[in-house]
Amino acid sequence: MLQITYSKKAEKFLRKQDKATQHRLFTAISKLPLEGDIKKMQGVSGYRLRVGTYRILFDVNGLIVDIIDIGNRGQIYKGV
């Protein structure tokens, strides 16, 4: 079984979202790293998952999935 950890930035973003958006994001995260529109990021380590207009940046270390950041499509890559 995979363990999922969240950065403070990711937790903060999730808390600010409405319940429907939170549900969509948590559902997508629960299926990591097996399903979804997943691509390896270029220039940095890690992967990105597309969930509608949101992007989830994560890394996989053995049985641990680290959620690095979550954000809107246009703004998520600026901090990376």
Give, region by region, the residue ranges found by the protein language model.
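Surface-exposed, flexible loop/turn segments at secondary-structure boundaries
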Residues: 12, 46, 75
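Basic, amphipathic "hinge/linker" alpha-helix immediately C-terminal to the N-terminal HTH DNA-binding motif
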Residues: 6-10
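Alpha-helical elements of the RecA-like P-loop NTPase motor core of helicases
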Residues: 12, 23, 78
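Enriched for short, Lys/Arg-rich terminal
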Residues: 1-4, 20, 31, 51, ...
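NAD-dependent ADP-ribosyltransferases
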Residues: 56
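A short, surface-exposed loop/turn module that caps and links secondary-structure elements
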Residues: 26-49
